[in-house]
């Protein structure tokens, strides 16, 4: 018997009055009203929902939008991870509802807008759930004689999931060294064998189509080509040629950006929504000269756009027409080593560089939680997550 989906009314944030006289102009941070004008930028900021617990929008390259709704992960109660489930908020009305009602924690960022489904994994079982009616189906049970399989993304037409298999030896390394700073360098220097696989979402058939002794990670399907997958060689960025694509039917990898100098780094790559370009954070060399790189998927032609040190962001993303970019800033201890880039930024093209507009002052945000910006499909708002009120919540700033 299906559990009835709970629909709760929240703030109708995108239909609020534009009358600035009713909206306070204040510093962003601490206990905030439901909407305010950022004192330092003049841009309106709103809290997406009023819901107990932590509310977390997706990682920057995972598309959360289905129609008028945005899918997100939320904890029930006091923000305990073990109580997390999947929710959706209507960006037109402000209503939010719970999608999953599992007896175990569910966190996923795998969403197909075309089929209106989310995909998630519990132990070795892979499930799909219809966002609109809550219908759930088991797709497959991943079996590995020596290791573990994890799903990572779904293609644009919802026909294939992609993921990685790792060995028991690699899994044991994570158990033995739970802190990232311990195992990260180990895997860079001495990676284990990994496999890329797909799952047919209708039949459950699993296809291991590529393997390499490398830390294969950061999987993303093209938003327009259902057979084109991007993946990375994970590790210390100055030691790896990171960004690759592969046709999942053909199984032949293609390097999309090759480092050209010592200590050059390129990463946090993403597909533009139009499917023609791949973008990435580029530093030549690391911590010295900063760019956003853009490579044409068909031709391999690359163009790099310069930004200032104080404008660097942990993550960048593009608008839906790819005519401007958004960045989420960074902490003073990030790779840019600058105490002036704690902002949500807008970047507009200006020849071979990007000119910047500041949207939100993030000086009261702890960047151990990365904001991970998303532009709404109407290109009018930027959604981000933040903890400047003492817990993880979701906000939107008006462009």
Tell me what each language-model feature is.
Residues 102-194, 208-211:
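Asp-box/WD-like beta-propeller blade repeats and closely related beta-sheet repeat scaffolds
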Residues 54, 58-61, 81-126:
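Blade-loop segments of beta-propeller domains
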Residues 22-28, 75-81, 163-191, 232-240, ...:
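Short, conserved, GDST-rich strand-edge loop motifs in beta-rich repeat architectures
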Residues 272-293, 301-355:
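Loop/turn-rich, solvent-exposed surfaces of beta-rich toroidal or solenoidal domains
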Residues 262-264, 304-317, 351-377:
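Conserved blade-ending motifs and adjacent loop-strand segments that build the rim/top face
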Residues 36-56, 356-360:
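A short helix->beta-strand "capping" segment at the edge of beta-propeller domains
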Residues 369-399:
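Blade-level signature of beta-propeller repeat domains, shared across WD40, Kelch, NHL, RCC1
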């Amino acid at each position: 018997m299906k559990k009835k989906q709970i629909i709760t009314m929240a703030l109708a944030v995108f239909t609020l009055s534009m009358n600035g006289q009713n909206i306070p102009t204040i510093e962003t941070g601490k206990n905030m009203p439901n909407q305010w004008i950022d004192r330092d930028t003049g841009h309106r900021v709103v809290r997406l929902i009023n819901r107990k617990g932590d509310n977390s929008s997706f990682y920057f390259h995972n598309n959360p939008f289905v129609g008028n709704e945005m899918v997100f992960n939320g904890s029930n109660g006091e923000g305990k991870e073990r109580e997390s489930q999947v929710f959706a908020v209507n960006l037109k009305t402000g209503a939010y509802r719970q999608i999953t009602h599992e007896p175990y924690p569910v966190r996923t960022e795998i969403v197909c807008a075309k089929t209106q489904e989310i995909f998630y994994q519990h132990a070795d079982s892979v499930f799909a759930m219809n966002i609109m009616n809550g219908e759930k189906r088991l797709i497959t049970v991943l079996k590995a004689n020596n290791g573990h399989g994890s799903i990572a993304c779904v293609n644009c037409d919802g026909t294939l999931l992609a993921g990685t298999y790792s060995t028991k030896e690699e899994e044991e390394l994570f158990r033995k060294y739970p802190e990232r700073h311990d195992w990260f360098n180990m895997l860079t220097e001495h990676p284990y064998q990994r496999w890329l696989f797909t799952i047919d979402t209708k039949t459950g058939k699993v296809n291991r189509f590529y393997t390499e002794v490398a830390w294969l990670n950061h999987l993303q399907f093209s938003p327009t080509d259902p057979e084109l997958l991007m993946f990375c060689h994970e590790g210390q960025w100055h030691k790896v040629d990171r960004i690759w694509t592969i046709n999942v039917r053909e199984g032949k990898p293609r390097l999309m950006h090759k480092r050209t100098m010592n200590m050059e780094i390129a990463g946090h790559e993403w597909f533009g929504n139009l499917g023609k370009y791949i973008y990435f954070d580029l530093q030549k060399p690391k911590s010295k000269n900063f760019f956003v790189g853009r490579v044409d998927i068909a031709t391999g032609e690359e163009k790099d756009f310069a930004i200032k040190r104080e404008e660097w962001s942990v993550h960048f993303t593009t608008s839906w027409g790819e005519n401007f970019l958004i960045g989420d800033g960074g902490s003073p201890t990030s790779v840019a080593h600058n105490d002036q880039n704690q902002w949500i930024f807008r970047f507009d093209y200006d020849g071979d560089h990007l000119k910047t507009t500041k949207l939100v002052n993030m000086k009261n945000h702890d960047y151990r939680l990365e904001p991970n910006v998303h532009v709404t499909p109407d290109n009018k708002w930027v959604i981000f997550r933040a903890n400047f009120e003492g817990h993880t919540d979701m906000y939107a700033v008006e462009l």
